[in-house]
């Protein structure tokens, strides 16, 4: 085909005018998505010059630019006005940062913490307005939940409760399922599932009245079978399914439900090396003799080191998660799922589309120990069978 002379400036002028208008209205998301869209438009321009006559090429390029800018538009948000939000787990991490951001935006924030005199609570008192109210709550204690429900009803009597952010979470152990005491599964379920369930059910009358929002911080570990995170992952899978069920059941009431799926971020609870060392020592101290001989103490030490090394990739900037929570609270049409964090798209692509063998190999290299258990190493004797019963005792640790 003979190449047509291509005055592409007309299409680009339309795209630039639309982009400028969106910028003036603060309605354009800047950053890598915008750069990627411009690169794709430039590639499309190059193809149009070679394959299409000018009128058709003008329509295609201008239409593609219009669609791209529409996708990059900031979704319309509801006004903050006098909205009140309850956030759990505000001692550290996502909860604390979200509480500070919502308070700065003008929300009435009810922030639950484990320790009213802890560093997180002290920081919130110092940096936030008098509108923010701190509430002590341990999600493993029904009496704490009941007290918070009563205080919330009284505190929001005039404004109503717009949103609940289920952020509090707990991970007790990083180890193979066989090495993980059953009590660690129960502890994760108490905080990550049953506590969130009881609190959410208790607040539903207020949320039905306001036609508000439920936002829950989940985890990719609830979607994918990460080795050595079974106790944490199963509890997150349970809460995700519960929230999906709520999403269907509460739709007629006008309540919108969202789940935030963050990648690896540098929160205090995740990167507390001393805490993970104590949990490793507790695991070793309570392992039955047979299991310790079959796996070897060096296997557990190596696994612990691999896990800590993986945390070096944790992202220090928590704002992507905080921004996702805020969007779920204020967007006119919030998403049911928000995926935040580096590499999550690739991980989900592998999990959903690659054959099972490749998926398992990928997950096995996530941070799992590459050292074989002692009984599987060449030249090692088989495991010793211990006929004594060991209940795997472990003291209960409250949510962090």
UniProtKB/Swiss-Prot annotation:
Localisation: Microsome; Endoplasmic reticulum
Main location (coarse class): other
Stated role: Catalyzes the conversion of biologically active 11beta-hydroxyglucocorticoids (11beta-hydroxysteroid) such as corticosterone, to inactive 11-ketoglucocorticoids (11-oxosteroid) such as 11-dehydrocorticosterone, in the presence of NAD(+). Functions as a dehydrogenase (oxidase), thereby decreasing the concentration of active glucocorticoids, thus protecting the nonselective mineralocorticoid receptor from occupation by glucocorticoids. Plays an important role in maintaining glucocorticoids balance during preimplantation and protects the fetus from excessive maternal corticosterone exposure.
Record key words, sorted: Endoplasmic reticulum, Lipid metabolism, Microsome, NAD, Oxidoreductase, Steroid metabolism
Phenotype upon gene inactivation: Homozygous knockout pups have reduced Na(+) and water content in the skin at birth, but retain higher levels of Na(+) and water in the skin throughout development and into adulthood at the expense of K(+), manifesting hypokalaemia by 15 days of age and contributing to salt sensitive hypertension.
Known regulation of activity: Inhibited by glycyrrhetinic acid. Induced by progesterone, through the Ihh signaling pathway.
Active-site residues from the entry: 232
EC number: 1.1.1.-
Annotated GO MF terms: 11-beta-hydroxysteroid dehydrogenase (NAD+) activity; NAD binding; steroid binding
Quaternary assembly: Interacts with ligand-free cytoplasmic NR3C2.
Name of the protein in question: 11-beta-hydroxysteroid dehydrogenase type 2
Entry's Gene Ontology cellular component terms: endoplasmic reticulum; intracellular membrane-bounded organelle
Alphabetized Pfam families for the sequence: adh_short
Source organism (scientific name): Rattus norvegicus
Family classification: Belongs to the short-chain dehydrogenases/reductases (SDR) family.
Tissue: Highly expressed in kidney, adrenal gland and distal colon, and at much lower levels in lung, hypothalamus, hippocampus, and midbrain.
Biased composition range(s): Polar residues: 389-400
């Amino acid at each position: 085909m003979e190449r047509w002379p291509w005055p592409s400036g007309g299409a680009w002028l339309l795209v630039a005018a639309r982009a400028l208008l969106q910028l003036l209205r603060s309605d354009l998301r800047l950053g890598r998505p915008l750069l990627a869209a411009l690169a794709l438009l430039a590639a499309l321009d190059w193809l149009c010059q070679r394959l299409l006559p000018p009128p058709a090429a003008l329509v295609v390029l201008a239409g593609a630019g219009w669609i791209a800018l529409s996708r990059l538009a900031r979704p319309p948000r509801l006004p903050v006005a006098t909205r009140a939000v309850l956030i759990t787990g505000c001692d550290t991490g996502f909860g604390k940062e979200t509480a500070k951001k919502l308070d700065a935006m003008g929300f009435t924030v009810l922030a639950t913490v484990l320790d009213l005199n802890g560093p997180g609570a002290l920081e919130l008192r110092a940096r936030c307005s008098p509108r923010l109210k701190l509430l002590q709550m341990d999600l493993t204690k029904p009496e704490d939940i009941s007290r918070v429900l009563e205080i919330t009803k009284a505190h929001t009597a005039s404004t109503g409760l717009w949103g609940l952010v289920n952020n509090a979470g707990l991970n007790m152990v990083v180890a193979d399922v066989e090495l993980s005491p059953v009590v660690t599964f129960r502890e994760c379920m108490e905080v990550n599932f049953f506590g969130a369930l009881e609190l959410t059910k208790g607040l539903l009358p207020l949320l039905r009245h306001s036609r508000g929002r439920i936002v829950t911080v989940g985890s990719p570990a609830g979607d994918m079978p990460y080795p050595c995170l079974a106790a944490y992952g199963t509890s997150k899978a349970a809460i995700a399914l519960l929230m999906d069920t709520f999403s269907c059941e509460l739709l007629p009431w006008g309540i919108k439900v969202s789940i935030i799926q963050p990648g690896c971020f540098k929160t205090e609870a995740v990167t507390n090396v001393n805490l993970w060392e104590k949990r490793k020592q507790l695991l070793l101290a309570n392992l039955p003799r047979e299991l310790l001989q079959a796996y070897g103490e060096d296997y557990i030490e190596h696994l612990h080191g691999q896990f800590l090394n993986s945390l070096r990739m944790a992202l220090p900037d928590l704002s992507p998660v905080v921004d996702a929570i805020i969007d779920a609270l204020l967007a006119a049409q919030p998403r049911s799922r928000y995926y935040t964090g580096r590499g999550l798209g690739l991980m989900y692509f592998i999990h959903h589309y690659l054959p099972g063998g490749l998926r398992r190999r990928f997950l096995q290299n996530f941070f799992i120990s590459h050292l074989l258990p002692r009984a599987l190493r060449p030249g090692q004797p088989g495991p010793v069978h211990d006929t004594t019963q060991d209940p795997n005792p472990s003291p209960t640790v409250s949510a962090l």
